């Protein structure tokens, strides 16, 4: 249980540091720097711990999963960070991801959707509908930029990437197991991050050469003293330390219990977002967050 709790906390820290990186560097550029640093750290760990665990048949599936999850999902995630903040972005992302995953498994694998699943889905959607109400801007410590509705759509796309990428990743794990090449969570994360890094690099190129000037002219150096601590936190807390704790938790507990605990991340990060961003959600938004997270917890326990 300690590992699951640590996973929740590290994912929460990853969110608030990632949001600051998105604001300081810009969503596309900041995400590329974060994934680049994470890829270097994960690559070193894989070379030391599991150098023989990467096989081409499973790599293809992990790479596809990474394109969807770390690629499309994280580009959208950082786009949302700089528009609606970390609290609402993570709430939409983590609460909607299981719904997208269930729909894909239903269409692709033929898994049924029972009445309990439908009830949980309705709870999640009702909570999200209440939670998207903007909080007070007068006490914000970090100035958001961009249109609010664009951030909402981006967070929903991030949830799609997260959920769909997770389903494809499970397929990759099954292929790796058949090959006898099942490595650690770090090995899987490295293969997925590589794909996300490629997708993010393409996104940066498109923004730089085809986007409006205001979207890239404010990009700062990742070596800026004010940026480095936040960038290190965003790169390490999530893809490296958070994933490692997540795999540790799965070794000790049933996956449903682990996912139920991790689903509390949007609640755990409320005080963090308040401290780092000055985020003060409305009472309705708080109630909505609790309802949505409760739906996800029940879904993971019942599914």
Regions found by a protein language model. Give the residues of each.
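Hydrophobic/small/kink-forming positions within alpha-helical transmembrane segments
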Residues: 12, 16, 43, 67-71, ...
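Interfacial helix-capping/hinge residues at the ends of transmembrane alpha-helices
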Residues: 14-19, 27, 77-78, 89, ...
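Loop-to-transmembrane alpha-helix entry segments
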Residues: 56-57, 93, 110-139, 148-151, ...
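Alpha-helical transmembrane segments of compact multi-pass small-molecule transporters, enriched
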Residues: 37-42, 92-107, 122, 195, ...
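Helix-loop-helix hairpin linking two adjacent transmembrane segments in secondary transporters
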Residues: 102-122, 171, 176-179
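Juxtamembrane helix-start motifs in multi-pass secondary transporters
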Residues: 30-31, 89, 188
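Membrane-interface interhelical linkers
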Residues: 1-13, 17-29, 33-64, 75-84, ...
